[in-house]
Each structure stands twice: as structure tokens, then as C-alpha cells.
Amino acid sequence: MENKKLTAANGRPIADNQNSQTAGPRGPIMLQDPWLIEKLAHFDREVIPERRMHAKGSGAYGTFTVTHDITKYTRAAIFSQVGKQTECFVRFSTVAGERGAADAERDIRGFAMKFYTEEGNWDLVGNNTPVFFLRDPLKFPDLNHAVKRDPRNNMRSANNNWDFWTLLPEALHQVTITMSPRGIPASYRHMHGFGSHTYSFLNAENKRIWVKFHLKTMQGIKNLTDQEAEAIIAKDRESHQRDLYESIERGDFPKWKFQIQLMTEEEADNYRINPFDLTKVWPHKDFPLQDVGILELNRNPENYFAEVEQSAFNPMNIVEGIGFSPDKMLQGRLFSYGDAQRYRLGVNSEQIPVNKPRCPFHAFHRDGAMRVDGNYGSAKGYEPNSYGEWQDSPEKKEPPLKVHGDVFNYNEREYDDDYYSQPGDLFRLMPADEQQLLFENTARAMGDAELFIKQRHVRNCYKADPAYGTGVAQALGIDLEEALKE
């Protein structure tokens, strides 16, 4: 039988795990009790900083399989041939809530993917919506503060939340999605995923094309009403996590169809909307979806903390054949995500097994807290050197990216104030019953927000479509004419 006797961290057997050392049966605890001190000290440090956003999450391993040839667009090895399979890890999450938040709350859902390719890890850090509230990362900390707890009373504040959202009219597209029936997915298995940002593909000829990534659930879309969600939360705050775990355990593996949209650099220069604006989508009629592969989740983690809580996703992690774009929000995340992981997990978080590349890597980074991989041994710690170590690969350079204009703090609202056309298009695509749910969900979510904030939201909705603003005003029980007065 395997030896499962209790030991201290250094391997020393523990003689007594029931009673502390004391001076006499009623006497004080002895500081010399090594197991008591070790056990308490480790307990005091068990909790690492939680993610500032996406704190409550669930994860699973799986496989990405290529079903369609896209090698004319990208030289990324993950897409190199039809039938190729790549191991991956996916973490789903709610966004605004803390670790103890309920899974079935009305919120955006995170959909973060890590592909363990032979060229390195590719992290596609997405959500279940194709857009976001913001197009400038300078306002991301403000969004966080608005949707988190109020600094005075430590309670969530509809007033703070909606005050911020309604003062940024470009947020209306995301707000409309969040307040729609899709604002509460029935489970992680029954929602779509999106890379959301614009990225770039680079092919064998080093030609660039812009790309957006989509994952369409093959289980079908299923959502919850507010009332259904409230009933579930009353009984099970881990409903989405339980559904994902149990479905994989019984062999009912969830799948998503992996698709892309493509836009040439010339098309981007001349298109009527800014293709790098995260508050807008690329219309499918102009840039149709193209099938690429299938993502299947088929293995649960063995330990939640080690594999889900310590997983770290960073959009900076790309592979050859995939690149970035002028998307401002993407560029902000390129810094912020890695910086947050270094704070949360340490500078060597890539050595944690769930984050570690499956291919050889030689990153030149040395030392730092919790360095456990040999630290590159006696290899030289500088470059250039005379010993052929740490050489770069100039043949891997991307083509030059054209930029336009002078460096300045440009106010994008001065040359792009089209905040309402796409939310209006989305509203008009909804059948009447979904529009009514949108009105009612919005009214409940606004709760006790001040009247002038509700009126401001009605004005924003009315600009997207008069029926949208009218319906929200009626659901809120406020006078439409008064609300429309600027």
C-alpha cells in the first residue's frame, strides 16, 4: 500500500495531528511545536490575491481540431493542416463578481483559451460577447470601480454602475447585450465565445490580414430569465461550474465551432466603421464567418486551485503567424493582463504547470521568486555573447505596420460619434418578446438608480431606436417626454 502517512513539508513524519504541545495539560501553547507553527503559517497564506475582474471561474482541458484549411491566411502551426489536434485549457468566468459570486448573475462571461502549440502557448482571452463597454483602456479602472462595491458602504451600487455606463454612450451596445435574454446564459456550455478584439494573421509570405475569432456553441443557445436565475441562485451558487464539471464527468463533452472573420488592410483603411473599435462588430454580411475547427472540452482538472485558480491568461501570448492590431483596448490589455498575473502569481507564473508551454522555451528571464526549473543552469546571462546562446530570429519579423497622424491625446468622440446605429440594429433584430424582456431586465437592473440617470439611459436608447427608448421608459415607469429633455 502506498505510504500516505502525514508529514511536514520537509518530509518529517508528524507524530500527533490532534493535539498541540503545551506546558502541562492546561498550560500555554509552546512556540517550539513545529507542526503547529507550520500548519498555521501555511493556512495564513493559503489565499492568493483574487483577480480584479473575472474572479469567479471554472475550467477544463480539451482539444482543438482543425477542420478547414486557412494556411493561405496564417502560418501559425496550430492551423497547419486539416485534422491537426492541439491540447488546450479553457477558463470560463463571471466578470464583476468576487470569488463567492453566484454563477447565474446577469453579467458578461469570460471565455479564456490557452492553446499549447508546438510553437508556444497562444492565449485567446475572450468573452461571451463580441463587443465591450469601452474603446479606450484609460477608462477600464473606472469601469471596474463602477461595477464593484461602493467604497462607502461596500455594497454593489446600481447608481454607480448606471451613472458610469450612461455617461459613455459607446457602452450602449454592450449594455443592450447584457440586458437582453443573453445576459444570463443557462450554463457555460450554452453560450458563444468571442475573441472580441481585432487581431492579425500573417501568412508564409508575411502578408497581414485582420481577423476576429468566434466560437459558436454546438449545444445551442440557452438563457435564463431573471426569475429563473434567482431560483437557481437560491439553491446553488455554483450552477454553471457544476453543470460544466458534471457534463464532462459523464462524457457529455461540450463543443464549439471555431470561426473567423477576415478583413484586408485595404478594406480596413476604407471601411465605414473603425474596425479596431471594440464597441462595434464587423457586420457578417460584409465579412462572413468562415469555419476553422472544433473546440471540445473533455477533461476536468484534478485540483481546482492548482489548475483553475492559478491559470493565467495573457493576450500578449501569441505564436508566429498571429499578431496584434491598433485596437486600443487590446493594446491596453497587452500590458495589464501580464502585469496583473505577475502581481497575483509572481514573476515566474509561467512555470506553474497549467501555464507552462509544452514546447521547449528559452526566455532569458532568470531568478525571481519561486524559480524552480533550474534557472537555465550555467548558460550565459547576457546577449550578445560569443557562445551561440540566446540568439534572436530576425527571419520571424512581422511586416511594417502603417500608422497615421501625430502623437496626441485624441478625443475619439470628435470624429466618431456613431454610438447608436449598431445597438439600434441589434434591437431591431430581436423579436417582440425579447425586446420586452430587454425593457424589463433593464428596469430591474437599474433598481434604485437616481431618476436623472434613468432618464439619461432612456435618451441613449431612444437615439438607437425610438421604440427602444419608449419601452425602457415604460418599464421604468417614467415620463418619456421628460426623459427626452436634454
Curated annotation (Swiss-Prot):
Family: Belongs to the catalase family.
MF terms in GO: catalase activity; heme binding; metal ion binding
Cofactors (names): heme
Reaction(s) catalysed by this chain's protein: 2 H2O2 = O2 + 2 H2O
Pfam families documented for this protein: Catalase (PF00199), Catalase-rel (PF06628)
Role noted for this protein: Decomposes hydrogen peroxide into water and oxygen; serves to protect cells from the toxic effects of hydrogen peroxide. May be involved in aerotolerance of B.fragilis.
Protein name as catalogued: Catalase
InterPro entries, A to Z: Catalase, Catalase_3, Catalase_AS, Catalase_clade1/3, Catalase_core, Catalase_haem_BS, Catalase_immune_responsive, Catalase_sf
Keyword presence, Zinc-finger: no
Keyword Cytoplasm: no
Regulation: induction: Up-regulated by oxygenation and stationary phase.
Alphabetical UniProt keywords: Heme, Hydrogen peroxide, Iron, Metal-binding, Oxidoreductase, Peroxidase
